[in-house]
Amino acid sequence: IDLIGEQAQANTLGYSWGFLTANLLGGMRGLFTVVQQYLYLYMPLLTMSLMSREYSSGSIKLLYASPVTSTHIILGKFLSMMLYGLVLMGVLFVMVLFGGCVIDNFGWGEALSGLLGLYLLLCAYAAIGLFVSSLTSYQVVAGIGTLVILAALNYLNQVGQSYEFVRDITYWLCISGRSGEMIAGLICSEDVIYFAVVVAMFLSLAILRLNS
């Protein structure tokens, strides 16, 4: 709302409304950017009890005794987080839809690209949190562990910036940079593959943990 007010004030003073969609969604204080910045703080609270609660309550024994495999258990937990992510994206889409109704020449491509980037980021966070939650029966430990990993992946691109080789590696591994490109309106197959690899890797680790 503040950004819309600033843009309206600038328009009143005779300045251009240029790149309004980019400013409102992907700018430094844009909607998608703010969601991206705080998502890694919020996701550990959602994922910390996915498996650790099963351990602490003893219900994991019932799951082992039921006719389901470890793969089914992990994929079922992950599917619930994917559905939650769709609900969150639906809420954001309502805001985007409102912007499309009130803004002339709204950048739908950029908006949908940003939603895709946030959804893939949420799925990656969920897979990481699910894996960490499978390592311990203590929910707080799982939450803190997930937060540490997500924070490291978000700020990894700030490490070793004075060395070109290290800078290239940390940039490639930094998860926020991948979603940031999509929020900016650029969908690259490399970024999509990156998220797919992260999700597959941590889900596989979680399945191996249950099988051990």
Predicted regions located by residue number:
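Long, hydrophobic alpha-helical segments
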Residues: 27-53
